[in-house]
Amino acid sequence: FVYHASRLGAEGYAISAVGDDGLGREILEELDNNSIRYLIEKVPYPTGTVQVTLQDGVPDYIINERVAWDHLSPTSNAIDLAERADAICFGTLGQRSAQSRETIQAILSFAPDDAYRCFDINLRQHYYTKELIEESLYLANMLKVNDGELVVLRICFIWKERTRRCSLVYRTL
């Protein structure tokens, strides 16, 4: 999100955390090389990693736990950015730990009322609950969802005929 926003001329920032390790340094260097602004804390946990495999073109993820981005904190700089944001993108995966969930929701609470709050639902493995989805939907005014995630939403919220209409809206966006 921030990469594309930055390339389109917006003042985008990545807010996250990395470990004080080689992967963390590599990420920061890559962000610098691509002129992407960021507020990234170095925390005493390893930088997050994900193993991705493809089965018939469909990705499967193994997302490591107890990593840096599970330990976000609501810094004053992040709150300052939120207070002047035109758009904020967040998802369920980033909220998998209680600490990061509280941080993301706190940061969102400082955004202006007219800011876009894009909930990129990102349903991965067991890192979401119906309650987390509901909380996040209430915080959002825009939803990014794929076909597979739409099926999960239908099951979670017992949508029947509405699913067809929702998928038509999604496909026309």
Regions found by a protein language model. Name each.
Residues 30-41, 55-173:
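Ribokinase/PfkB-type carbohydrate-kinase core domain
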Residues 1-50, 54-58, 65-71:
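Substrate-binding N-lobe of the ribokinase-like
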